[in-house]
């Protein structure tokens, strides 16, 4: 006779077996794509598919059956968030030391929920728990359906008796099936940002990372794309674009598993960043943003641009201001009279505002060069006896706005701030200081320093409510990473790289809460700090200190893979020996500005520049809010050609630039095929922004073309050494 106890045990066993066999399939869909997660018999969560959406969602559950792998490896390679320390032999997404010293973590699926935020946005939250420890990971998947964007992040939390040490804590752990993968990333340095490199990924791990702290993107931005099966073109091929929304150290691991598939682990760089997490405290990772296209790089870029303008970039659907910067006109050598004299040039040029750059502050150690004054944000009385308010007033009287440059995260050793608050500086004890551009980085981990940095902006904007623009610079990396504040609080120094960035965000959040509307440029010694978390607070970014227009064609082209043109600050300067028209036309790829001595321009050049800004105003909505189509790649051809089309397909503007000045004759023989038009409509084409006296390219404004013709056959913009830049306006004829 079977005892009641045995019956009870059998019932429990059968119940557990039944639960284990209840496979959970979680499809996370956008308009065209889907990421499918699925549990196995042990409730481990895997990624079983990332690709085009199926018509019948019930079929997602069958996908995993089509793959055959070694039973000993099943679920390791494609784990949705791979923990370290147990049966995993691959690169982990999560590595933990538990409160009792145990270095292993197991994560099992326990629940998920999907919340519809609005008609386009949906959030899926998946909860994973360790079966032994009170340790929990939540995976967040936010989808933007129309834009085909997937945003991922992770939250880690525990209820253990002692602190848990997080040694690695990725934002995302993706899995791509295939046989060949081609990674394109962007290397470089100061004045040579965004240089593309394409590599076919082989067995093992390819890592992209930075350890620079501030100005973290100096050598490499946190953005890439992976082509599957073959290198993608603008219009063909399967490609995944990804970018991490984090203004600090990052690490991307691309690992081909034993089956030839690709594991992708992205997030904060764990280098020198073990994080001690208290019980009942949540650690949130930054967002990893991806888009998947089966129609080439162009579609993927347009997905990101559309999403950024609508959901991430500050005032992404608004307007932008053109400006004149004083830097190349004066450098540090200016005074009140000289600056006011430049206002007339700004007005004559027709820009919206005048931007005062570096050198306006500090008294005991005047900011007359780059080795003194940073940190002392009072107007220099010798240069500006009547203060910033006087300049704002005079600019307003001249009919232009007034903006100002700051670098609030930094300090020169030769400053009053350094003398009073050496404890506010990141520096190693008992060791000599190391300087980058003669400066050190303030300890934004410290709330007092956060208050100080916020106060710089708050004081300027409170005293001068008509200030029209802020340029926020960041010229140094973090050397000697040590926080006196962390030591005083008895917190690990390994928190410094994470908490510095969080401190920066706290300051920016306060600035935007109080001053939501002021335009702000994100700058970091050029393009050393461009990401989608920082751009929540900034309306635009500075791509590079290299303003040679030929180099800028390439830098701006490569930034366009990830960031919309409305955010790109492109200035006309004295750099480069190309004609003024070429420089202005290149600047029109985004938001143009000027860094010149207007009074030194010949009368005909000034008249052309003024007219160019009026021309730009007539096409600015196309550039800012249109769909970008890259037509001819300058890395592979003698010209660059790109087009912005209105979303209703009624207008487009096409920019063409000569990029090989060794070519004396027409470098382009064949017509350029356009994109973004309606094949059933008719269009007229005319050349705009022509320099007076220059001959046209032979296109008749009286001829109409079907969109079908323009996209299948094309037109020749006739770019030559004498016509080194050509802008064509395409308008529907009704």
Residue ranges and their predicted role:
Residues 1-23:
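Bacterial Sec-dependent N-terminal signal peptides
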Residues 22-37, 44-255, 271, 682-695:
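Polysaccharide-binding surfaces and accessory modules of carbohydrate-active proteins
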Residues 32, 226, 633-679:
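Carbohydrate-binding surface patches
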Residues 75, 85-107, 236-249, 291-313, ...:
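Glycine-rich, aromatic-flanked loop segments that form ligand/cofactor-binding clefts
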Residues 102-107, 275-294, 723-731:
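Short Pro-Gly-centered flexible turn/kink motifs
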Residues 315-455, 464, 469, 486:
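Aromatic-lined carbohydrate-binding/catalytic grooves of carbohydrate-active enzymes
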Residues 412, 418-451, 498-600:
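Glycan-recognition surfaces
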Residues 660-734:
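C-terminal beta-sandwich/jelly-roll accessory domains of carbohydrate-active enzymes
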């Amino acid at each position: 006779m079977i005892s009641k106890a045995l019956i009870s045990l059998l019932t429990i066993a059968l119940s557990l077996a039944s639960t284990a066999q209840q496979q959970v399939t979680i499809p996370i869909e956008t308009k065209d794509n889907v990421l499918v997660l699925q549990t196995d018999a042990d409730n481990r969560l895997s990624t079983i598919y990332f690709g085009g959406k199926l018509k019948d969602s019930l079929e997602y559950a069958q996908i995993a059956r089509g793959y055959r792998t070694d039973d000993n490896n099943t679920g390791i390679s494609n784990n949705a968030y791979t923990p370290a320390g147990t049966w995993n032999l691959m690169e982990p997404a999560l590595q933990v030391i538990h409160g009792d010293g145990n270095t292993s973590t197991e994560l099992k699926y326990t629940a998920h929920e999907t919340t519809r935020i609005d008609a386009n946005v949906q959030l899926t939250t998946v909860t994973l728990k360790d079966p032994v420890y009170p340790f929990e990971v939540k995976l967040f998947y936010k989808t933007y359906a129309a834009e085909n964007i997937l945003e991922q992040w992770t939250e880690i939390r525990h209820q253990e008796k002692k602190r848990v040490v997080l040694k690695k804590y990725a934002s995302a752990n993706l899995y791509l099936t295939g046989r060949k993968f081609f990674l394109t990333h962007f290397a470089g340095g100061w004045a040579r940002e965004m240089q593309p490199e394409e590599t076919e990924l082989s067995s093992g791990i390819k890592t992209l990372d930075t350890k620079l702290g501030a100005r973290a993107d100096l050598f490499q931005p946190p953005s890439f794309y992976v082509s599957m099966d073959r290198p993608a073109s603008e219009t063909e091929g399967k490609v995944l674009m990804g970018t991490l929304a984090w203004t600090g150290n990052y690490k991307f691991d691309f690992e081909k598993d034993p089956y030839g598939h690709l594991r992708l682990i992205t997030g904060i760089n764990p280098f020198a960043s073990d994080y001690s997490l208290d019980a009942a405290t949540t650690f949130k990772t930054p967002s990893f943003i991806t888009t998947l296209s089966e129609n080439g790089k162009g579609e993927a870029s347009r997905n990101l641009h559309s999403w950024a303008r609508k959901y991430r970039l500050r005032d992404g659907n608004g307007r932008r201001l053109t400006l004149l910067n004083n830097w190349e006109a004066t450098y540090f050598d200016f005074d009140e009279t000289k600056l006011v004299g430049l206002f007339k040039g700004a007005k004559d040029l027709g820009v919206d505002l005048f931007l005062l750059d570096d050198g306006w502050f500090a008294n005991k150690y005047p900011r007359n060069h780059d080795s003194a004054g940073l940190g002392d944000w009072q107007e220099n009385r010798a240069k500006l006896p009547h203060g910033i308010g006087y300049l704002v007033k005079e600019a307003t009287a001249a009919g232009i706005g007034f903006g100002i440059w700051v670098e609030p995260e930094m300090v020169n050793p030769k400053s009053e701030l350094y003398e009073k608050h050496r404890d506010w500086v990141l520096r190693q004890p008992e060791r000599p200081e190391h300087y980058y551009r003669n400066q050190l980085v303030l300890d934004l981990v410290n709330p007092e320093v956060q208050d100080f940095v916020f106060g710089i902006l708050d004081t300027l904007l409170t005293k001068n409510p008509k200030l029209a623009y802020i340029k926020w610079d960041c010229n140094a990396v973090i050397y000697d990473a040590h926080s006196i504040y962390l030591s005083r609080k008895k917190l690990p120094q390994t928190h410094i790289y994470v908490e510095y960035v969080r401190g920066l965000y706290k300051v920016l959040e306060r600035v935007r809460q109080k001053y939501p509307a002021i335009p702000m440029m994100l700058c970091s010694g050029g393009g050393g700090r461009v990401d989608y978390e920082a751009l929540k607070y900034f309306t635009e970014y500075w791509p590079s200190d290299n303003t040679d227009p030929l180099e800028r064609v390439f830098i701006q082209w490569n930034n366009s893979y990830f960031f919309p043109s409305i955010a790109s600050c492109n200035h006309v300067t004295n750099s480069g020996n190309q004609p003024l028209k070429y420089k202005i036309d290149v600047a029109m790829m985004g938001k143009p500005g000027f860094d010149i001595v207007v009074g030194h321009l010949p009368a005909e050049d000034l008249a052309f520049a003024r007219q160019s800004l009026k021309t730009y105003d007539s096409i600015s909505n196309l550039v800012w809010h249109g769909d970008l189509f890259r037509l001819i790649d300058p890395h592979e051809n003698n010209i660059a050609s790109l087009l912005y089309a209105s979303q209703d397909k009624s207008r487009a503007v096409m920019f063409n630039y000569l990029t090989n000045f060794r070519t004396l004759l027409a470098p382009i023989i064949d017509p350029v095929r356009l994109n973004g038009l309606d094949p059933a409509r008719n269009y007229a084409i005319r050349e705009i922004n022509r320099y007076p006296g220059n001959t046209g390219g032979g296109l008749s404004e009286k001829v109409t073309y079907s969109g079908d013709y323009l996209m299948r056959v094309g037109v020749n913009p006739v770019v030559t050494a004498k016509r080194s830049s050509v802008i064509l306006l395409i308008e529907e004829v009704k």
